Amino acid sequence: MKKTRQSNVELLRLLAMFMVLLLHAVQSFQWPRGGFLMSQPLLVHLGFSFVEMISVVAVNVFVLISGWFGIRPTMRGLGKFLYQCVFCCLVVDAVLWAVGAENLSFSMLFEAFTLRQTGWFVPSYLLLFLLSPVLNAYVETADEQTQRRVLISLFVAQSVGAFVLKIFADFNYGYSLLSFACLYLLAQYVRRFQLQRLARLRSSFFLLIFFGVALLHTLVGSIALFGFGSKVFQQIILYSSPLVVVQALALLLYFTRQTLSSTLVNRIAAGSFAVYLIHQHPGARPFYASICQKAFMDAPPAPGAAALLLWLCVVYLVCVGVDELRRASWELLLSRRKAEKS
């Protein structure tokens, strides 16, 4: 039986992918090292910093959502995920070839079918998908005390050992299966054992934590940037930062408290992963970055910011539209397979 999607969480999934667009838009200016932004007024600097601080949670939020509901791995689910990745890569390759920006070659097709055009996230999430039966079995059998101790140990290792002391390379600053597994187990633990206790808190409390951490990061990061350089600034907003993890969890808890039912939200959110796959394709990334720069730099800050947001919305809608084609082709393949079996 097909599960009904919870629109409140699907809205968060949709928002998280827009945060990815925002984050990469900010990074297209080589922030915080870029000379253009450093020459702008303080208000522009603080604005870009704050946008980065609220957007950096996107990856953690995406993984936490998977942990909240639990991944139920099936061959069909795996096939659907891989098909989406390959389809989006091939669409970008086809467009690049059509406009003369890329030559059609065996190596291009090989990279598309082996997921080499999907960046670091897809391989890590694919490994999480494959490992999920083990994680699910653990959370279903281990008691609350055991899970709490394991989580404390893992996050101390990540926060202190990897983030501060940098002695556990396997966490890779949050860009790894190990960090994904920690987030997955955290979401499962909170949903299974802490919801009753957290129910005493208002939903606005979690939103306050989210924006409060973002504001704190903005202020501390700005002081670090101008006082100690961009390297320190970048260290405080790694995915493995304990405050970034808390910020992401707070945002998830806020949205789980909301009530929403929307077929449109569910539909758009279902295709939102295509946004990442398409705009982060190695061939599309420079084009995306150049338009982000042009949109903001060719106008005063306020109109430039509006133009930049409009561009991000266009990218989002185009990518979701491409995923609708992917969805239709996937359903066509399934229907033909059923017809052949009957």
Where are the predicted features?
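Membrane-cytosol interface segments of multi-pass membrane proteins
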Residues: M1-A157, L201, Q258-R267, G271-A274, ...
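Interfacial loop-to-helix transition and helix-capping segments at the boundaries
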Residues: L46-V59, L109-S124, V164-L183, H217-A248, ...
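Short alpha-helical scaffold segments that flank and stabilize functional sites
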Residues: F69-G70, V190, L253, V275
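Alpha-helical transmembrane segments in multipass membrane proteins, preferentially the mid-helix core
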Residues: L128-A137, Y184-Q196, V245-L260
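Loop-centered beta-sheet repeat module
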Residues: Q147-Q194
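Alpha-helical transmembrane segments and terminal signal-anchor/GPI-anchor hydrophobic tails
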Residues: G161, L178, Q196-A274, Q280-S290, ...
